Curated annotation (Swiss-Prot):
Protein name: Proline--tRNA ligase
Assembly description: Homodimer.
PROSITE patterns: AA_TRNA_LIGASE_II
Catalytic activity: tRNA(Pro) + L-proline + ATP = L-prolyl-tRNA(Pro) + AMP + diphosphate
Gene: proS
Main localization, broad class: cytoplasm
Species this protein is from: Citrobacter koseri (strain ATCC BAA-895 / CDC 4225-83 / SGSC4696)
Length: 572
């Protein structure tokens, strides 16, 4: 490709509304342009990267035995009503009616569509297992699209769905997809972790996220410093402390705390160690409970894990925090004065709270706290559960080492769905015993557009993007200095351009009438891994300057050796 025949829409300045580095560089490198909130046009440079990501995904899906299909973006509402997700999915599901007043949705995912297809196409266990995938545009009406294509409303996704007659068969496919995902992200040159995860709104039994490690990530990735244990923050278990509860050394006293409505204020004003404080959160109780609310207690320096809390049998799903009005009507005190002593609703405490002694908590009286509270002396020990987020330094749940926490960008997610959708949509086949058998399902997603942004978040410097070779828009940049004035530079540039292309190498030759500084800046900005610079001074010695984008190292290569050198560098 020649720049004179190409749309190289680079920008010198960073757009003001671009928050994260990937969004900034994708705009500056001429990869994308914003059409509307959360909607982007992919320009040629960006599309080349996107297609390379897509091709790697497709190759590994094929290698794993998945079968490619293509399903409609527009889906009839009755399928979503049949599955129960019409009400559950919320405002991210874009709903509309056609001219006949028939309701439809723009598909954010395709569990319903593929299950409907399978229930009409398959009849016998002999046809299974099967695993179908597509790479297709999805739409989710995000309330606040942000970070460019990282959290856009329209995006390209690879979604796959497998069907089985046994858990053992599902596990085999799940393991194969786990391995395929690991190959995909390894081929792309990404630093990633596969972590255990909660199944969330998709539902099901088991789940893993694939997280690209990056400071700009929205997720906390938890892993051991001494083993392969890895999980996301929602799933990671906070191990119960091994040390027994210390004996009480203080009497419980009622203290006036009129200006301490938060743990931070309590600690500061009364010089308390935060590890000796407890915070109390009230949430809605499950429907049918004899109490409207449930009290959840975590140590003052810990955070409630809402996913874990929602799974408690006493707690309503989705987890809903009580309003101040609801709290005052029941407890007769505000949210800043709550504690376990004389709490009129069921209490669940975190494992760490269970081993605390001589601690401080609200007295359920406005402007007052109890200091020196001890379990079983001042208040009975309530139900104990793991309801907090882990913190760095916690022991690893597998007993090996301690936990580290890094930020991550979720680029893939695999689920063992079980029979959630097949039961709802009555997808079954005749089993080996001749009886009707509900199918067991798995689903496997990769955010193809998100992978592009995640790769940039991991691969950039002060000059621009530093693409991993496998997904770079071009493999080689040819920069002929003053080619429009030097016949030999122009002649050699054309010769090398043709020879490299004949070797199957993707080349961008900058044949613009631009200053060398502009040419260098643009090629470094868009991140082409290998650059050769042709100039009269070096050609006097039969040399060509080669530069590797990742480390910036330069070397002189003889003109007769440059093609073989590049072929070896790229193809090995």
């Amino acid at each position: 490709m020649r720049t004179s025949q190409y749309l190289l829409s680079t920008l010198k300045e960073t757009p003001a509304d671009a928050e994260v580095i990937s969004h900034q560089l994708m705009l500056r490198a001429g990869m994308i342009r914003k059409l509307a909130s959360g909607l982007y046009t992919w320009l040629p440079t960006g599309l080349r990267v996107l297609k390379k990501v897509e091709n790697i995904v497709r190759e590994e899906m094929n290698n794993a035995g998945a079968i490619e299909v293509s399903m409609p973006v527009v889906q009839p509402a009755d399928l979503w009503q049949e599955s129960g997700r019409w009400e559950q999915y919320g405002p991210e599901l874009l709903r509309f009616v056609d001219r006949g007043e028939r309701p439809f949705v723009l598909g954010p995912t395709h569990e319903e569509v593929i299950t409907d297809l399978i229930r009409n196409e398959l009849s016998s266990y002999k046809q299974l297992p099967l695993n179908f995938f597509q790479i297709q545009t999805k739409f989710r009406d995000e309330v606040r699209p942000r970070f460019g294509v990282m959290r856009s409303r329209e995006f390209l996704m690879k979604d796959a769905y497998s069907f089985h007659t046994s858990q053992e068969s599902l596990q085999e496919t799940y393991d194969a997809m786990y391995a395929a995902y690991s190959k995909i992200f390894s081929r792309m040159g990404l630093d990633f972790r596969a972590v255990q995860a909660d199944t969330g709104s998709i539902g099901g039994n088991a789940s893993h996220e694939f997280q690209v490690l990056a400071q700009s990530g929205e997720d906390d990735v938890i892993f051991s410093d001494s083993s392969d244990y890895a999980a996301n923050i929602e799933f990671a278990e906070a191990v119960a402390p091994k040390a027994p509860r210390a004996a009480a050394s203080q009497e419980m006293t009622l203290v006036d705390t009129p200006n301490a409505k938060t743990i931070a204020e309590l600690v500061e004003q009364f010089n308390l160690p935060i590890e000796k404080t407890v915070k109390t959160l009230l949430v809605k109780a499950v429907e049918g409970s004899s109490y409207p609310l449930v009290a959840l207690l975590v140590r003052g320096d810990h955070e409630l894990n809402e996913v874990k809390a929602e799974k408690l049998p006493q707690v309503a799903s989705p987890l809903t925090f009580a309003t101040e009005e609801e709290i005052r009507a029941l407890v007769k005190a505000g949210p800043g004065s709550l504690g376990p002593v004389n709490m009129p609703v069921p209490v669940v405490i975190d494992r760490t709270v269970a081993v605390m002694s001589d601690f401080a908590a609200g007295a359920n009286i406005d402007g007052k706290h109890y200091f020196g509270i001890n379990w079983d002396r001042d208040v009975a020990t309530p139900e104990v559960a793991d309801i907090r987020n882990v913190v760095a330094g916690d022991p690893s749940p597998d007993g090996q080492g301690t936990l580290l926490i890094k930020r991550g960008i979720e680029v893939g997610h695999i689920f063992q769905l079980g029979t959630k959708y097949s039961e709802a949509l009555k997808a079954s086949v005749q089993g080996e015993d001749g009886r009707n058998q509900i199918l067991t399902m798995g689903c496997y997603g990769i955010g193809v557009t998100r992978v592009v942004a995640a790769a940039i978040e991991q691969n950039y410097d002060e000059r621009g993007i530093v693409w991993p070779d496998a997904i770079a828009p071009f493999q080689v940049a040819i920069l002929p200095m003053n080619m429009h004035k030097s016949f030999r530079v122009q002649e050699l540039a054309e010769k090398l351009y043709g020879e490299l292309r004949a070797q199957g190498i993707e080349v961008l030759m900058d044949d613009r009438k631009e200053r060398p500084g502009v040419m260098f800046a643009d090629m470094e900005l868009i991140g082409i891994p290998h650059t050769i610079v042709l100039g009269d001074r070096n050609l006097d010695n039969d040399d060509i300057e080669y530069k590797y984008r990742r480390n910036g190292e330069k070397q002189l290569i003889k003109t007769g050796e440059i093609v073989d050198f590049l072929v070896k560098a790229i193809k090995g």
